[in-house]
From Swiss-Prot:
Its main location: cytoplasm. GO terms for cellular component: cytoplasm. PANTHER family: S-ADENOSYLMETHIONINE:TRNA RIBOSYLTRANSFERASE-ISOMERASE. The gene is queA. This is S-adenosylmethionine:tRNA ribosyltransferase-isomerase. It comes from the Bacteria. It catalyses: 7-aminomethyl-7-carbaguanosine(34) in tRNA + S-adenosyl-L-methionine = epoxyqueuosine(34) in tRNA + adenine + L-methionine + 2 H(+). Transfers and isomerizes the ribose moiety from AdoMet to the 7-aminomethyl group of 7-deazaguanine (preQ1-tRNA) to give epoxyqueuosine (oQ-tRNA). The lineage of its organism: Bacteria, Pseudomonadati, Thermodesulfobacteriota, Desulfuromonadia, Desulfuromonadales. HAMAP family: QueA (MF_00113).
Amino acid sequence: MLVKEFDYHLPEELIARYPAPERDGSRLMLLNRESGTIGHGLFRDIADHLRPGDLLVLNDTRVIPARLFGRKATGGRVEIFLVRRQETQAERWSCLMRSSKGMRPGQLITLAGAMTALVVERLEPEGWLLEFQGAEPFSVWLEREGEMPLPPYLQRPAESGDQLRYQTVFARSAGAVAAPTAGLHFTPELLERLAERGVATACLTLHTGPGTFQPLRVERVQDHRIHSERYHISAETCQAIAETKQRGGRVVAVGTTSARTLEYAADEKGGLCPGSGDADIFIYPGYRFRVVDALVTNFHLPESTLIMLVSAFAGKEYVFHAYHEAARLGYRFYSYGDAMFIE
């Protein structure tokens, strides 16, 4: 299976540079795997397509303002992208860096607000280990000085509105450097209406990493090595999923991050055990889903691992037909774009 088989043409004007005025005002494409039909609606009406007894599984990760800017001792500008905090007493992070000239261990980067970053070592296969030191807790400093890490395809700097809109309303656990975008469409009022309809919710955590934006650098899909991301599933969520299955309800994954976490943590029979760890599951056509019965997701980049997961869930031909139809009808694509519900 070749990566180029997952390519498609998208006019630039269909890339959503900004979110819709209202979270739940996005369009919603409706796919039914059994009938092969394609329908259309608004996201705020998703309750009409869910059933009492269904369980929405949400990713409650919180996006950190992971983009930082500093200066080397020479005055050269450095851009830092936080990836993952290391499990050490010191405030050490694996990072990606961009600089006019190469970096080396031992260099000190000066940041705003009396914060410095020491370059500790080069990491393989890419990135750097930095140690941050300042007069106040790093987390407090970061919330004030960091910039929201918008996807590169938005081709614009982060603005004040992104602090709110590039974050789900149920975000709790800080650690992601990319939003679980399917969750951006939900409002507290919509979640309340779903609960009144008998649709339950449960949360897990997957801290989305920068690999979600990185292109596949291989020709064959099966040769790709996917990035790992930290996850956590509670005993309460595992129990809710088991009880939903026993009652005949559907487990509806909100986003590819929730779907990957559920499938990674499941055993051969679809059973789940609570726990934490690093998820590195790569789902592409041919994979048999063990837990997920329905999926809420956005429209994804060509040749991405995300469109491969959606193709595995609904069938590649069906998904690409839906994508072409969405482009023809002027749907908005990518992180701030419209959504689809696949059942």
